[in-house]
A protein has these predicted regions:
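Short, solvent-exposed beta-strand-terminating loops
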Residues: 17-21, 76-86, 131-133
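Conserved active-site alpha-helix within GNAT-family acetyltransferase domains
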Residues: 134-139, 147-174
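Conserved N-terminal entry element of GNAT/NAT acetyltransferase domains
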Residues: 1-37
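Conserved acyl-donor/pantetheine-binding loop and adjacent beta-alpha core of acyl/acetyltransferases
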Residues: 67, 71-109, 113, 117, ...
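Conserved hydrophobic beta-strand within the GNAT/NAT acetyltransferase core sheet
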Residues: 107, 141-143
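Short hydrophobic/aromatic beta-strand or adjacent loop that forms the aromatic wall/cage
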Residues: 61, 177-182
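A short helix-loop-beta-strand connector motif used in the catalytic cores of GNAT acetyltransferases and
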Residues: 39, 45-65, 81-88, 106
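Conserved acetyl-CoA-binding loop-helix of GNAT-fold acetyltransferases
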Residues: 107-112, 118-135
Length: 188
């Protein structure tokens, strides 16, 4: 398995990966970046164009791609909380310290290609995000995955509490019965 940051050279690989699923084919990982009406109005090609701009004009990169045998099989969005205004401003994150938004990185979503799931790709991506964020000056990494370890039929793109815990994250808040804020402090 190889993991690479999103850049211009990876946009075709991301298109192939996202094209394998109706949700990712429409959203293009814009859900937490833009107002809902803009994401929905841009469903498909417009969101793809926005994603390609993210790949070419954003630093740090908008996420990481996991490759197996030269084919993109997984994705994890990442970046400073300032990049994700919908997430940072949500009721789930109401207790966050906004003064940390530039230094604390956020992991809003994952996607793994059908046929490659349940192989540990998401965990490898999350571990790579932690390392990458630390190398680029982040003081912590957060996510708001699904709480517990029950069978979740929806919202798995957020990750799960056991996934984050396995990667050294600690629960810092439980804003709803279904969601938990997980955080990993970085000492780099």
């Amino acid at each position: 398995m190889e993991i690479h940051p999103l850049g211009p050279a990876q946009t075709d690989d991301a298109a192939d990966l996202f094209g394998s699923n109706a949700s990712t084919r429409g959203c293009w990982c814009m859900w937490f970046l833009l107002p809902v009406r803009d994401v929905q109005a841009g469903w498909g090609d417009t969101n793809r164009g926005r994603f390609e701009m993210l790949a070419t004009e954003t630093s740090p990169p908008g996420g990481l791609l996991a490759y197996q045998d030269g084919k993109a099989v997984g994705w994890c969005a990442m970046g400073p909380r300032t990049r994700y205004p919908r997430a940072a401003g949500s009721k789930l994150m109401a207790q966050r310290d906004p003064d940390e938004d530039a230094d604390v990185w956020f992991v809003p979503c994952f996607f793994v290609r059908t046929g490659s799931r349940r192989a540990g790709i998401t965990e490898q991506l999350l571990r790579a995000v932690v390392a990458y964020a630390g190398e680029h000056g982040a003081t912590a990494v957060e996510g708001f995955p699904l709480a517990g370890d029950g069978p979740h039929k929806t919202d798995r793109y957020l990750g799960t509490e056991p996934l984050f815990a396995a990667c050294g994250f600690t629960a810092i808040a439980r804003p709803t019965p279904r969601r938990v804020i997980m955080r990993r402090e970085l000492a780099y």
